[in-house]
């Protein structure tokens, strides 16, 4: 029996964790018992969820401080289960502030730690590399440049490929999708993706809805509900906004993106998904002012959107903090809806990003390559 602790605190990490668990079961010569932190996708993949990701998913320094007692309690709940089950290996997926503390605690218990999906140490708070050096057995990274970064810092690292580089979606017939959600197939459809955490949505959604108001009723607006949230809560957020336009909640972000003519997307994994699926979008983001002031002192980047970082230049427009206004979002989305030079340029740019993400692919999936590394670490005696 191979016992694995898997921890993913966000929707994107949970998606990678579920795929990794499937790959582990496929490749492991022994039965796999998995437990940890996650949500419905990981539960469906057979992981015994000890801590639900909804209970620890907060964003920004000010927000984290407000929820520290609850997060502390869930942290120790997970550790108690690790003490009871004694896993052969732990896989921590992104979510660095929580996971670096967890890595330290697991290391002290003699449990080897594999970190899957690197925090952006190359962008900010590089001092955290010391935590990786001390407590992480191996880094599994999803961007090629990250492998070199870690090796330069004497950390064992492997580029497994980006799971989303393999992303393909069977596109539902437009008429079928329209009937399912009561949409007008003659109108352009615009995706609204405000993030996967409650505080994030509360900071971002009102401005996106204001942008939709400015764009007007000539479009249909689709809002997929992340697995870390629920439709009732999201509907309540919409109802709290004065005179919102008609917004349709959907259950599948990828299908929503591939069906959308253009999209407004919060910074994060959804920007990579939109790039791979070829949906033109504008990236937006906002955090609490305190979080922003502290973050700007630490971040070493001029760009924030992952597609822009991958390409090394602006491929999509990014509107962050005070630059994130309804007028600017509406203007960019309007240009992306129209068959004009802006839409054509962004589509060309996104094709280049897809090439970067798909480079170095083999016959194995990214999850399978990651699973082989996890199995190797679990079997090592060093």
Swiss-Prot record:
GO BP term, pick one: lipid A biosynthetic process
Keywords: Glycosyltransferase, Lipid A biosynthesis, Lipid biosynthesis, Lipid metabolism, Transferase
Gene transcribed to yield this protein: lpxB
EC number(s) recorded for this UniProt protein: 2.4.1.182
MF-aspect GO terms: lipid-A-disaccharide synthase activity; phospholipid binding
Its job: Condensation of UDP-2,3-diacylglucosamine and 2,3-diacylglucosamine-1-phosphate to form lipid A disaccharide, a precursor of lipid A, a phosphorylated glycolipid that anchors the lipopolysaccharide to the outer membrane of the cell.
Pfam families in the cross-refs: LpxB
Name this polypeptide is given: Lipid-A-disaccharide synthase
Family: Belongs to the LpxB family.
InterPro entries membership: Glyco_trans_19
Pathway per the UniProt entry: Bacterial outer membrane biogenesis; LPS lipid A biosynthesis
Name of the top EC class for this enzyme: transferase
Lineage: Bacteria, Pseudomonadati, Acidobacteriota, Terriglobia, Terriglobales
Catalytic reaction equation(s): a lipid X + a UDP-2-N,3-O-bis[(3R)-3-hydroxyacyl]-alpha-D-glucosamine = a lipid A disaccharide + UDP + H(+)
GO cellular component: membrane
């Amino acid at each position: 029996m191979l016992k694995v602790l898997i921890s993913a605190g966000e929707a994107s990490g949970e998606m990678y964790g579920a795929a990794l668990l499937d790959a582990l079961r496929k490749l492991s010569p022994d039965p796999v018992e998995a437990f940890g932190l996650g949500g419905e996708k990981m539960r469906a993949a057979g992981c015994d969820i000890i801590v639900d990701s909804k209970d620890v998913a907060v964003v920004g320094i000010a927000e984290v401080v407000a929820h520290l007692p609850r997060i502390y309690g869930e942290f120790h709940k997970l550790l108690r289960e690790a003490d009871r089950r004694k896993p052969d290996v732990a896989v921590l997926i992104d979510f660095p502030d929580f996971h670096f503390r967890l890595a330290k605690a697991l290391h002290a218990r003699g449990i080897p730690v594999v970190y899957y999906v690197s925090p952006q140490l190359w962008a900010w708070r590089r001092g955290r590399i010391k935590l990786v050096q001390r407590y992480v057995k191996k880094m599994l990274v999803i961007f090629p440049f990250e492998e070199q970064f870690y090796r330069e810092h004497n950390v064992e690292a492997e580029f497994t490929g980006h799971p989303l580089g393999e992303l393909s979606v069977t596109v539902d017939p437009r008429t079928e999708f329209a009937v399912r959600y009561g949409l007008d197939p003659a109108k352009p459809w615009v995706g609204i993706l405000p993030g996967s955490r409650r505080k994030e949505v509360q900071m971002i959604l009102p401005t996106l809805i204001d942008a939709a108001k400015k764009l007007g009723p000539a479009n249909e607006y689709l809002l997929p509900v992340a697995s870390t949230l629920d439709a009732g809560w999201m509907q309540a957020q919409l109802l709290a906004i004065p005179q919102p336009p008609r917004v349709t909640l959907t259950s599948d972000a990828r299908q929503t993106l591939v069906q959308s003519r253009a999209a407004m997307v919060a910074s994060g994994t959804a920007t990579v998904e939109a790039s791979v699926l070829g949906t033109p979008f504008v990236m937006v983001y906002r955090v609490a002012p305190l979080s922003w002031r502290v973050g700007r002192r630490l971040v070493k980047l001029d760009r924030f959107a992952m597609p822009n970082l991958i390409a090394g230049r602006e491929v999509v427009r990014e509107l962050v903090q005070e630059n994130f206004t309804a007028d600017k979002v509406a203007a960019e989305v309007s240009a992306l809806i129209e068959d004009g030079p802006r839409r054509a340029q962004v589509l060309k740019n996104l094709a280049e990003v897809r090439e970067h993400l798909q480079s170095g692919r083999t016959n194995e999936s990214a999850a399978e390559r990651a699973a082989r590394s996890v199995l190797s670490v679990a079997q090592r005696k060093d």
